[in-house]
Amino acid sequence: MKGLNYMLCIPHTSVSRSMLEAQCRRLINNIPGWELIRVENMMRLRCTFTFPDFREALAFTNSVGELAEAEQHHPELITEWGKVTVTWWTHSVKGVHMNDFIMAARTGVVANI
């Protein structure tokens, strides 16, 4: 399989569905540091990135924001002093879609992990 960070997000259609948990558990190994969580009965991908100060955390947040805008797929970003928690999921499918794995991998590239 081509590296997730090199893949492009695909547009959603009315028949797009969330991935099964078993599929997610197989793919999670391809994105180091990420975990599969369930919130409001929906699977999500989450990772917390650490930084030496708020300035670098904010710069990372802005870089992820640029990436999200370019793909028109947006994560939940929680920026705090020295850390940023990024959570990806797809509202329209009520769970995790392949695009979320792609964006998580690309987020890791932004963080240099």
Curated annotation (Swiss-Prot):
One of its GO terms (molecular function) is 4-alpha-hydroxytetrahydrobiopterin dehydratase activity. It catalyses: (4aS,6R)-4a-hydroxy-L-erythro-5,6,7,8-tetrahydrobiopterin = (6R)-L-erythro-6,7-dihydrobiopterin + H2O. Its EC number is 4.2.1.96. It is an enzyme of class 4 (lyase). CDD domains: PCD_DCoH_subfamily_a (cd00913). It holds the Pfam family Pterin_4a. The keyword Lyase applies. Keywords: Lyase. GO terms for biological process: tetrahydrobiopterin biosynthetic process. HAMAP family: Pterin_4_alpha (MF_00434). Belongs to the pterin-4-alpha-carbinolamine dehydratase family. This is Putative pterin-4-alpha-carbinolamine dehydratase. It comes from Pelodictyon phaeoclathratiforme (strain DSM 5477 / BU-1).
